[in-house]
Amino acid sequence: MKKIAVILSGCGSRDGSEIHEATLSLLAIDMNGLEYQCFAPNKNQTEVVNHFTQAQEQENRNMLVEGARIARGNIKPIDEINASDFDALWIPGGLGAAKNLCSYFYDGANMKVLPEVETAIKSFHKAGKPVVALCIAPVIVAKVLGANVTSGKDAGTASKIEAMGGKNTVCNYDEIAYDAEKRVISAPCYMLDASISQVWLGIKKAADKLKEIL
């Protein structure tokens, strides 16, 4: 069975992995007869946000510990990812991708990528293995690989992707961008004002495309 490494960035749309996107990703991977293993950096999030009030909280939360909520405890530190053990890499969105896995939320096109995340992306790419990124996470792949990705219809994000050396493809909620040369698949998800069922259509299409090219 083909195996997919999934990188989480916490638990929650405002400061970690977007829970709908992460859960639907695992469902889509599983429905395609693929196996997954979740990973996350064993580091504190840059912020903790109260998802009810939207206020920033004065506390620390660990990405690995928080990601374990989504993974039902079956999660490993990101430095244990070995591209030779997996067939593809998958990164759900959520502001944790833009705050914790990289500094895009704070620095825009001048962002830095967490070294462990950059190493993982480069190792899969070097091995010729696909990378899937959802929502805001494609900015990371654009920065690291200069890939053609989608930010939905967000012109501001698109311009920053291009400033970082990537290319942007405008997509609706039920569409994906596929960079055949770099083997990168991306879907806009909640970069659009979409319902959970609409987000599912894009994620399922990304998973279907992944299975097709594996």
Model-based region annotation:
Residues A5-M31, E35-Q37, N74-L214:
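Active-site-adjacent pocket-lining segments in enzyme domains
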Residues M1-E18, E47-E57:
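Accessory recognition modules or surfaces
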Residues F39-V65:
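N-terminal beta-loop-helix "entrance" segment that forms/cooperates
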Residues Q58-N74, D79-S84:
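Glycine/small-residue-rich loop that forms an oxyanion/phosphate-binding "nest" at active or ligand-binding sites
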